[in-house]
Amino acid sequence: FFSLFSGWRVMAPSNAFDYIGMFNTAMRYEDPVVMIEHGMLYADQDDVPADNMDYYIPYGKANVVREGSDVTVLTYLTGVKNCLQAAEELAAEGISAEVIDLRTLDYTGMDYATIGASVQKTGSVLVVEQSPRSLSLSGRLADEIQERFFDYLDCPVGKVTAPDVPSPVSKKLEEAFIPSL
């Protein structure tokens, strides 16, 4: 939601290591920074350097978490883990998915260099996120990718989002609401 407004720096770490590095980076900015946390990530066990908590994750630098050659999958937060799992299942069917953790979601911080390099390699893009389509980043991101990298695309940019319904409060409805395999 905040990524749709100019002037905000929006960071969305998908793991504890990135959270610490991005938090340290955010503390250096004078601009307003929103750090999006997802409650479903709190239980994850991630490695962080015990001897050095002063590292930085560069603002505006996406992370290619899985190399691939058939489709580029752009995601963030809990989507990273879900998309890595889906990529493993696709690999068993002979489809090679490149998964990119966007990390930074605002317009000025979007890493179009990394996205573009991947699009040129795969020719196909899928944006996966948990937000309802009407409030999602996927529409703006799909438009931008189609404008910037049209000559490299073999098909329109695909989007996987949550349905346009109010966010559920029960665990069972939440599981049905969140895009999954």
Where does each model-flagged region fall?
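Conserved thiamine diphosphate
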Residues: 1-29, 167
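Glycine- and acidic-residue-enriched helix-capping/beta->alpha junction motif
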Residues: 26-32, 141-145
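Thiamine diphosphate
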Residues: 39-181
